[in-house]
Amino acid sequence: MKYYALALCGVIFAVFLLQQIPGFTEAFLLSGFDRPWTLVTSIFLHGDPMHLLSNLFALGLFGLMFESRFGEKRLLAVFFAGGIASSIASAFFYDASLGASGAIFAIIGVVAVTMPRMIVWNLGVPMPMIVAAIVWLLLDVAGVFFPSSTANMAHIAGMAFGAAVGIAWRKPEKRVANKPLNDEDIDKWEEEWM
């Protein structure tokens, strides 16, 4: 593993430092389709330190999970393609948009579909990854009806993109044939667990 997820975090942090230069953010902010390069550049911009830190944490955590299973090339492909998909959704719904969360939600979508039983903490509660992803998705759907500075449609588009990729990449599970238990197996289980 080459830790591209952490390298992306480093690039995003460096861009945030550059955003302190007057006019930098405005030059690369997504504000419609008239400047198509901003579909990509806006992914690396963040509105404030909390926005930045929450996205860096999520990208580091879920990006490393993704990268360890699928590799760095697929990580970059999903990050950029999912980020562009979420930027396109944002351009339809918001006057201006920035942030890596749509790209991160694409990564989360792949992880949720391909590693659904992996336990993660969400809202202080341990739960399977697929359940956590559904909770986040439902929060974003609810957020659409309560306007805020969060680009909920970007999150939803990123998650949908990632889930579609995850379904395409998912390997069929090997089914274990159901064989009847015999008395010896039951006794062994009782000795171990009772």
Task: Briefly describe each language-model feature range.
Residues 1-194:
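A detector for small-residue-rich transmembrane helices and their helix-helix packing motifs
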